[in-house]
Amino acid sequence: MSKRETTKYKIDRRMGENIWGRPKSPVNRRDYGPGQHGQRRKGKLSDYGVQLRAKQKLKGFYGDISEKQFRKTYEEAARRRGDTGENLIGLLESRLDAVIYRAKFVPTIFASRQFINHGHVNVNGRRTNIQSYRCKPGDVIEIREKSKQLVLVLESVQLVERDVPEYIEADHNQMKATFTRIPAFADVPYAVQMEPNLVVEFYSR
């Protein structure tokens, strides 16, 4: 198992949920957390615990990004007009690593981050190696010509376990996608329930 898979499944085990809806997730085979005491009944979480869990789950979904970066994203969402939770989801889904993952050019969010780091991605014709690059409506994201035959890409576009969301137009023949709009929370196809309102409550304490 690769390091990316180990990290991904570690997050699943920690949360006790199959966050990305992957068939091989270890939580598909058991209904308790990791460790020798995993089968013990868990006590009821406090309000703080529920809010913390919601934050950790959302943060984990986007590749377990750092707390500093996640909080910075939240603070930007809070400064914007409108609902902070909606703004937070829109900002997270606008990240380049999220768009590459949602377009099904790579199998996991972790692979997306590595793919970008290694310089395999163009945005509007220019190489971009910043995972957190904020895509804008109309941005064209493309796998660089020399990278289109990588096994990682070829295997990913054949996956049928998840669909490309409506706010991304993906052409898998050309390995190109257009980020058409910033999505609302209701538009985002999470495999498990996400609760951005609880994340807002966590940071508002």
Curated annotation (Swiss-Prot):
<dbReference type="Pfam" id="PF01479">
    <property type="entry name" value="S4"/>
</dbReference>
<dbReference type="GO" id="GO:0019843">
    <property type="term" value="F:rRNA binding"/>
</dbReference>
<comment type="subunit">
    <text>Part of the 30S ribosomal subunit. Contacts protein S5. The interaction surface between S4 and S5 is involved in control of translational fidelity.</text>
</comment>
<dbReference type="InterPro" id="IPR036986">
    <property type="entry name" value="S4_RNA-bd_sf"/>
</dbReference>
<keyword id="KW-0687">Ribonucleoprotein</keyword>
<dbReference type="InterPro" id="IPR022801">
    <property type="entry name" value="Ribosomal_uS4"/>
</dbReference>
<feature type="region of interest" description="Disordered">
    <location>
        <begin position="1"/>
        <end position="46"/>
    </location>
</feature>
<dbReference type="GO" id="GO:0003735">
    <property type="term" value="F:structural constituent of ribosome"/>
</dbReference>
<dbReference type="InterPro" id="IPR018079">
    <property type="entry name" value="Ribosomal_uS4_CS"/>
</dbReference>
<keyword id="KW-0689">Ribosomal protein</keyword>
<feature type="compositionally biased region" description="Basic and acidic residues">
    <location>
        <begin position="1"/>
        <end position="16"/>
    </location>
</feature>
<keyword id="KW-0699">rRNA-binding</keyword>
<comment type="function">
    <text>With S5 and S12 plays an important role in translational accuracy.</text>
</comment>
<dbReference type="InterPro" id="IPR005709">
    <property type="entry name" value="Ribosomal_uS4_bac-type"/>
</dbReference>
<comment type="function">
    <text>One of the primary rRNA binding proteins, it binds directly to 16S rRNA where it nucleates assembly of the body of the 30S subunit.</text>
</comment>
<comment type="similarity">
    <text>Belongs to the universal ribosomal protein uS4 family.</text>
</comment>
<dbReference type="GO" id="GO:0015935">
    <property type="term" value="C:small ribosomal subunit"/>
</dbReference>
<dbReference type="GO" id="GO:0006412">
    <property type="term" value="P:translation"/>
</dbReference>
<dbReference type="GO" id="GO:0042274">
    <property type="term" value="P:ribosomal small subunit biogenesis"/>
</dbReference>
<protein>
    <recommendedName>
        <fullName>Small ribosomal subunit protein uS4</fullName>
    </recommendedName>
</protein>
<dbReference type="InterPro" id="IPR001912">
    <property type="entry name" value="Ribosomal_uS4_N"/>
</dbReference>
<dbReference type="InterPro" id="IPR002942">
    <property type="entry name" value="S4_RNA-bd"/>
</dbReference>
<feature type="domain" description="S4 RNA-binding">
    <location>
        <begin position="94"/>
        <end position="157"/>
    </location>
</feature>
<keyword id="KW-0694">RNA-binding</keyword>
<dbReference type="Pfam" id="PF00163">
    <property type="entry name" value="Ribosomal_S4"/>
</dbReference>
